[in-house]
Amino acid sequence: MTSINTNTAAMSALQTLRNVNSNLETTQGRVSSGYRIAEAKDNAAYWSIATTMRSDNGAVNAAADALGVGAAKVDVAYAAVESAIDVVNEIKTKLVSLNESTVDDDKVWDEVKQLQSQLVSIANSASFNGENWMLGATTATNSVVTGFVRTSSGVQVTTETVTSGSFALFAKGANGLADTTGGVLKDIAAFTTVSLASSAVATSLNTVETALKALTTGRSILGSISKRIDLQTDFANKLSDAIESGVSKLVDADMEEESARLSALQTQQQLAVQSLSIANSSSQNILSLFRG
């Protein structure tokens, strides 16, 4: 039945057009943002999970950054200890050479003095972010971030206290530079021509061996900490990638699917507009019934 008061066909076509426009707006939003769930109203449960996981991922990345700082501290100290071992071994070689009757003792002493200066230079240069583990009392300790744990309240970093004084090359002077009266190399720094005399070479070699033992132990400690930090950093990176991937599966839009849906909805919109136009024109047909 055709009525001049109510155009049911037009009402139906208009409702269809509204639905198509609503779906089209949603799809266009997904295509432009890349998100299937961009706001809580899209899916409150998934949006809440994604928001929490993004926050956790930020904390994991912050922990990874802290691990990077810790790794840098350890690497600087490790490099310093390793260089010191090389220099002390060179001093050891010079001392052993004194057993040769053809060796010029004065030249050996000149070389040893240069090596002593090199040890001081290594100690003074081994600083990162204001911390120098190569200078300090035998009881000196330093804290370094070595890992992190995830708890119900979030992500917390874990630290390890390193007794750096057990392998510190020298004590720390009032001016912040090496004080050669302390540290594992203090006795080597105190070598004089007397220490290189034939009667004292054996004692001096024992001093060198003691220092090498302390430095080797220090290198082992630093190496194990460095390895642990590397493993934790690798885990943090993998965990961050896994979280990001999980969030993506929850809220990201399938662009191929959305693109296909967009094309279909645009076609539906055109058809709905035509349908509404046809429905509206039906009232004009009633007028033709009254024309002579």
Predicted ranges, named:
Residues 1-12, 16, 32, 36-253, ...:
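Amphipathic alpha-helical coiled-coil/heptad-repeat segments
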Residues 23-24:
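N-terminal glycine-rich anion-binding loops that anchor highly charged ligand groups
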Residues 129, 262-263:
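Short loop/turn microsegments at loop-to-beta-strand junctions
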Residues 253-262:
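A glycine-biased, small/acidic residue-tolerant capping/turn segment at secondary-structure junctions
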